């Protein structure tokens, strides 16, 4: 992809590349074939109707993911530039690839309440209120490949972790 920015009136293009794990460039960056993500889900749900036209539902859940697939951080620097150039990509500023980077655990609660108000000849109104809370924690992080360790590049950064725990849908 290409991103253009203008700074002090000068246009600056940034070229990025997302590579396949089975490509020569992917292999040079330490990419490996992707394993399927495995999930285990535990949940408990309760419903309660304390009076006519009112319902309350509470669901609690835990989702454990093993070998979660995510994008690496944008890999850049002299060592990366050398790998890119050796594979015919001298005009690329940074590169990413997908990998089994994390094991995660998500815990959450959903609460839904609804009440149906009868308006006689005018019909009815159904009032509904919902609440959700969830939190994702990283329980394991994949090792950095030796190809990147050798040039002091980490494929997982604080931002990469934040995309999993705070930004991605849970």
Protein language model features and the residues they cover:
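Outer-membrane beta-barrel signature, preferentially recognizing the C-terminal barrel domain
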Residues: 1-57, 64, 89-109, 114-118, ...
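Gram-negative outer-membrane beta-barrel transporters
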Residues: 57-170
